[in-house]
Amino acid sequence: MGGINGYEIGNLSSFDIKANDNTLFADIKNKHNTMNSSSAESLFQKLSKYADNYKESKCYWVQILAKNSFNEKWFGEINGKEYSHSRVYKISGDQFYKLLSGNENALFELYKILPEAILDYLKNQESENFQNNSALEEIKLSSKKSNRNILNEITFENYSYYLGFDKLE
């Protein structure tokens, strides 16, 4: 995402990605349920601080493996305290790719080119490196049972409800 024009990754800073003009700050997490309440409170306070310090900014908690597609203000109760800020949001991975790229199906289009990139990568690796990878073996077995390729097997388990992914056959 940091390769998208106008954005940079936050190498060892307190944000994961931001707009070059400081109008967007984001903290990226794989799943919403990987954070406990104190982590959520800390993240909300961090994003609120960016929003307060940069008056034109919007700040996002990005959930890459969210259960739905969404882009909404983040408000709620954490540790018995109510939290809200007019420019602090939570957003799913597909919506965040859309926001940064301006392309509604950006994550889906990235997905579509992954098979070629993965094949190129695998061709350059020694096969013995993958023989000891039990996770890869489990995915291979599962994909054979479902008659899907490996990438589709992984994707259908995680992204079937995201923007554009309903177009997969």
Regions found by a protein language model. Give the residues of each.
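Acidic-basic catalytic patches of nuclease active cores, encompassing PD-(D/E)XK
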Residues: 1-11
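Alpha-helix C-terminal capping segments
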Residues: 4-5, 17-19, 50-54
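Short, surface-exposed recognition loops or helix-turn segments adjacent to catalytic cores
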Residues: 11-20, 63
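Generic structural motif recognizing short loop/turn segments at the entrances and edges of beta-strands
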Residues: 13, 22-24, 55-58
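Conserved catalytic cores of phosphodiester-cleaving nucleases, focusing on short active-site segments
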Residues: 17-35
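Catalytic cores of nucleic-acid endonucleases
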Residues: 31-93
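Charged, structured surface patches that assemble and position nucleic-acid processing machinery
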Residues: 76-169
